[in-house]
Structures are given as structure tokens and as C-alpha cells.
């Protein structure tokens, strides 16, 4: 019984393996493709009438001689025109050391079909691609996805805010303020509701935190284009800062003091804008960019946090 089981396993493995004749047929079908991508069914050397070890000078002379005979300006025969196209293609392949080396390798190793094909397309189409065009295309694609992502996140945040009780209560209060507390069931009432909701939506867009409104100026593509301007602006700002506060020892302007305070507290710009003026002034007056003041402020915040517990 064990012998029967072994025979069965052997027959299954033989059935799973592809027949040798099929593999041989596939290889024989693919091998001509390796050479055909260069000069189709012809041999590039035979088209120019030179040997495979011919030097560049001999190849140029052969091409010049054949062009005098088969060039469309010299010979109007349609068949001669077709032949000249093949001759010109063969010359383009053999005059360049790189493509000629790849062609010689394809002749010597016709079984490496996929490698030879990849080498051919890399040589003929890779160098024709302008890196600047690739970079611009890549930036456009990335910027498009970036904008869609920003728009999706912002729209989702707006819809989430609209479902909150605070938004609905504010909407009712604004409607009450507009209508004077008079409820109307006329046709224009729905239009009034839409206008009120639109006004409130604009207010929500200004006050929403955590998600910024989509902007073309924040896209990577736009930032890349404006990179020289941005670098110049930063360098100019740093120079002015150094000159004003390091050399001349002037007191900090209000905007610069706000900037130092915001950087010390690690507060994003949009969050800082939403802080009321009284709290801003209170924070700026503490001069938190100075180490001792910052340590004192942190200690006060910790005490306040413990007291509230």
C-alpha cells in the first residue's frame, strides 16, 4: 500500500509540473522577440552590410554609401524608402556604443528576453523623458491628491460641527435675531432659513479649529514654485531680526513679541489667532521667551492644575 501511495504522489507532481516540450515552445517563441525589437526580423549588421566587429568609422561609411542609394531624395521607389527606414534605424542602433553593446548582448543571449527588452526600452525612451517634465507631473499629481485630502477633511469637519447642539442653538438664535422672533410659514421663510444658515456656516468656517480651510498656497507644487521667494523672504526676515534686536538692541515689536510667545508655548498660528486679545496680551507681558519666566509660568500652570483637581 505504501508503494501505491508513492506512485500516486509521483503522478501528482508530474501532473503539476509543466511539460518540457511546452517550456521549450515558449522559449522558442520568445527568443526572436529579443532581437526583433531592434531591427525587426533583420540583422542590424546585415542591413548595413558590415561585420559585427566593424568599427564606428566603417559603420558610418556603410551608412553613407547606402543612403546615397536608398535615400528618398535619391530614390523615389516605395520599396527603397522602406529599406532606407530600416537602414537608418540600424545605423542609429550601431553608431552608439551603449545601444550597440545592448544589441550585441541580445544577439549573444537571446534567451534573456525580458532583460533585453527592458534594456531596449530604457535606452530608447528613458533618455527621451525630460526630468523637468517628470518632476512637474509628479508635483501636479501630489498636489491634486493633497488638495482633495484637505477638502475632504475640511468638509467632514464642517459637517461634524453642524451636527452639534451648539451649532443648532446658534442657528436658532441667529434666526430669531433676524426675524425678530416672528415665525413665518410663508414661502420666503425657507429662503430666510437658507440665508441664515449660510451666514452661520461662514462663521463656523472662521472659528473651526484643528482643520485648516483648503488653500492652493499650501500645496506642495505651489510651495515648490515659490521656494526661491520663500527662502529670500526668510533670509530677509532673519537679517532684519538680527539687525533690530541683536545689533541695535531695540525692544520687541508687538507682532514679534507675539511670535516669540507663540514659539515658546508651541502654539500653531491658527490657534493663536483664535485666542482673545486679553489672554494674548497677558501671555506676551509675561515674556515667556525668557527661560526664567517660562519656568515660572510652567510652575504656575502645574499648581493651578493641581488646585482644580
From Swiss-Prot:
Example GO BP: protein folding
Entry keyword set: Chaperone, Endoplasmic reticulum, Glycoprotein, Membrane, Signal, Transmembrane, Transmembrane helix
Entries under SMART domains matching the protein: DnaJ
InterPro entries: DnaJ_domain (IPR001623), DnaJ_domain_CS (IPR018253), DNAJC25-like (IPR044632), J_dom_sf (IPR036869)
A GO cellular component annotation in the UniProt record: endoplasmic reticulum membrane
Membrane topology: Multi-pass membrane protein
A Pfam cross-reference name: DnaJ
Family annotation (PANTHER family): DNAJ HOMOLOG SUBFAMILY C MEMBER 25 (PTHR44176:SF1)
Entry protein name: DnaJ protein ERDJ7
Amino acid at each position: 500500500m505504501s508503494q501505491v501511495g508513492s506512485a500516486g504522489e509521483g503522478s501528482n507532481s508530474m501532473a503539476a509540473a509543466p511539460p518540457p516540450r511546452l517550456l521549450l515552445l515558449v522559449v522558442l517563441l520568445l527568443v526572436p522577440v529579443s532581437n526583433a525589437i531592434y531591427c525587426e526580423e533583420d540583422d542590424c549588421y546585415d542591413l548595413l552590410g558590415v561585420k559585427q566587429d566593424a568599427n564606428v568609422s566603417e559603420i558610418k561609411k556603410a551608412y553613407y554609401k547606402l543612403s546615397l542609394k536608398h535615400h528618398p531624395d535619391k530614390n523615389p521607389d516605395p520599396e527603397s524608402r522602406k529599406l532606407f527606414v530600416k537602414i537608418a534605424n540600424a545605423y542609429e542602433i550601431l553608431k552608439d556604443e551603449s545601444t550597440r553593446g545592448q544589441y550585441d548582448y541580445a544577439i549573444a543571449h537571446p534567451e534573456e528576453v525580458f532583460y533585453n527588452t527592458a534594456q531596449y526600452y530604457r535606452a530608447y525612451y528613458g533618455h527621451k523623458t525630460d526630468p523637468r517634465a517628470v518632476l512637474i507631473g509628479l508635483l501636479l499629481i501630489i498636489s491634486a491628491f493633497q488638495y482633495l485630502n484637505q477638502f475632504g477633511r475640511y468638509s467632514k469637519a464642517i459637517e461634524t460641527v453642524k451636527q452639534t447642539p451648539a451649532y443648532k442653538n446658534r442657528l436658532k438664535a441667529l434666526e430669531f435675531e433676524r426675524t425678530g422672533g416672528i415665525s413665518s410659514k410663508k414661502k420666503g421663510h425657507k429662503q430666510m432659513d437658507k440665508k441664515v444658515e449660510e451666514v452661520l456656516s461662514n462663521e463656523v468656517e472662521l472659528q473651526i479649529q484643528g482643520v485648516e480651510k483648503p488653500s492652493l498656497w499650501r500645496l506642495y507644487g505651489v510651495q515648490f514654485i515659490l521656494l526661491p521667494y520663500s527662502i529670500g523672504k526668510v533670509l530677509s526676515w532673519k537679517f532684519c531680526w538680527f539687525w533690530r534686536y541683536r545689533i541695535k538692541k531695540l525692544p520687541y515689536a508687538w507682532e514679534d513679541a507675539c511670535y516669540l510667545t507663540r514659539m515658546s508655548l508651541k502654539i500653531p498660528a491658527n490657534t493663536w489667532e483664535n485666542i482673545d486679545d486679553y489672554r494674548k496680551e497677558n501671555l506676551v507681558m509675561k515674556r515667556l521667551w525668557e527661560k526664567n519666566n517660562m519656568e515660572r509660568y510652567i510652575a504656575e500652570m502645574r499648581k493651578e492644575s493641581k488646585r482644580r483637581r
